[in-house]
């Protein structure tokens, strides 16, 4: 029975696409922090980045709360970079940073509540689908 399943041909809907892989990588990165009592936010943002393109998305964050902002890509060779900025725009201090193939995360603790801007850049020579989510405590 197992041999029949392993030898079964894949249908188009069985093959995960790049957008799905980006979301899976972002969610897996966020879930890595649940052991530290972080709660994964039920929501995400995703887009496609051209080579050397950067995009900005807005996040509502609150003072004194710890956040892990997690980024995933469906492109294994992706070279992603991210930073968080206030509306001033001033960079928010990054407490910790994790960088892995296809995913990354930054830990921040904003001093004030408000709208913050996450800048994501694709430093790779190929387009990449990316997905962002975050967890907090």
Spell out what each predicted region is.
Residues 5, 39-40:
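Short Pro/Gly-enriched beta-strand edge/turn motifs at strand-loop
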Residues 13-17, 43-129, 135-137:
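Acidic, Ser/Thr/Pro-rich low-complexity intrinsically disordered segments
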């Amino acid at each position: 029975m197992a041999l029949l399943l392993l030898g079964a041909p894949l249908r188009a809907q069985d093959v995960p696409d790049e957008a799905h892989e980006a979301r899976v990588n972002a969610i897996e990165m966020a879930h890595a922090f649940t052991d530290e009592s972080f709660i994964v936010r039920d929501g995400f943002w995703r887009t496609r980045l051209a080579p050397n393109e950067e995009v900005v998305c807005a996040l509502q964050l609150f003072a004194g709360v710890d956040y892990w902002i997690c980024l995933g890509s469906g492109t294994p060779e992706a070279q992603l970079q991210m930073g968080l900025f206030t509306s001033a725009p001033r960079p928010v201090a990054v407490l910790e940073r994790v960088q892995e193939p296809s995913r990354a995360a930054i830990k921040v603790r904003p001093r004030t509540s408000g709208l913050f801007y996450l800048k994501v850049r694709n430093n790779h020579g190929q387009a990449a689908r990316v997905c962002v989510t975050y967890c907090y405590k």
